[in-house]
Amino acid sequence: MKWSEISIHTTEEAVEAVSHILHEAGASGVAIEDPAELTKEREQQYGEIYALNPDEYPAEGVLIKAYFPQTDSLHETIAGVKSSIDVLPSYDIEIGTGNITVNEVNEEDWATAWKKYYHPVQISDTFTIVPTWEEYTPSSPEEKIIELDPGMAFGTGTHPTTTMCIRALEKTVQPGDTIIDVGTGSGVLSIAAAKLGASSVQAYDLDPVAVESAEMNVRLNKTDDVVSVGQNSLLEGIEGPVDLIVANLLAEIILLFPEDAARVVKSGGLFITSGIIAAKEKVISEALEKAGFTIEEVLRMEDWVAIIARNA
């Protein structure tokens, strides 16, 4: 079978949104070429544990590659992807050039091409993200491994917003905590919470493909006794109280449910949010405070922030 490699040149801010659009369009694999990966802060903090080839990354911006089987409807699929990306600026998401190119690849090439972008990455004092096909031995008994198959995943666990959420969970999760993960994507935050000692994690996503991906990764990490995955829109119809809510979503989406979060999280409980570019920190903080939360800590990495807020 012949496959088409769709390459989109965009910004780091738009990576999650564009990746989601591509998965929604039926992509069978997505690879992200972000030159920031070459100089990640974690390399100074934890030591470089893999080598990347700078020649494979764009000089500026981010290149997202997605793989689609060649069909009679491919042209319409690409047009739909472009239309969806063109709408993102109306949500204050900078898309950069948004240029789209198409190349033909053989099945044997695409099946392994995107895997070269995923390697074991230690993202915190506790966790290392490991692709399922990689051999990796923990460096200490305390190191926790999260295995991910990013073939369908919405994020690989190494984006700054996901990294900060995991570090925030490390700071806050107590044994026996009950947790809700809103917009779970690959399930990585739910898996981390389970491995940190949570007794119950409810993971929700509106996208059925994300739900399938999260379920697979939860089983892969043997955390399905703690984590339940379901399809749901944000916190609609969800009852509390729970000890903690975590949501790694675009700022525009977070603004839709601070009041629901305050309703579901117990008094004194926590709401961890990320997916927030630095320029939108103030508007998110104000919305959380208006809903009754107190900002306890703000984590920063590159141009992104994560907020830890406590309910009244």
UniProtKB/Swiss-Prot annotation:
Assigned keywords, A-Z: Cytoplasm, Methyltransferase, S-adenosyl-L-methionine, Transferase
Main location: cytoplasm
GO biological process: methylation
Main EC class the enzyme belongs to: transferase
Binding-site residues for S-adenosyl-L-methionine, renumbered to this chain: 162, 183, 205, 248
Highest taxon of the lineage: Bacteria
InterPro entries on file: Ribosomal_L11_MeTrfase_PrmA (IPR050078), Ribosomal_PrmA_MeTrfase (IPR004498), SAM-dependent_MTases_sf (IPR029063)
Subcellular location, record wording: Cytoplasm
GO molecular function: protein-lysine N-methyltransferase activity
Any Pfam family the entry gives: PrmA
Catalytic function, reaction form: L-lysyl-[protein] + 3 S-adenosyl-L-methionine = N(6),N(6),N(6)-trimethyl-L-lysyl-[protein] + 3 S-adenosyl-L-homocysteine + 3 H(+)
Role description: Methylates ribosomal protein L11.
Family: Belongs to the methyltransferase superfamily. PrmA family.
Record's protein name: Ribosomal protein L11 methyltransferase
Species in which this protein is naturally found: Bacillus anthracis
This protein's encoding gene: prmA
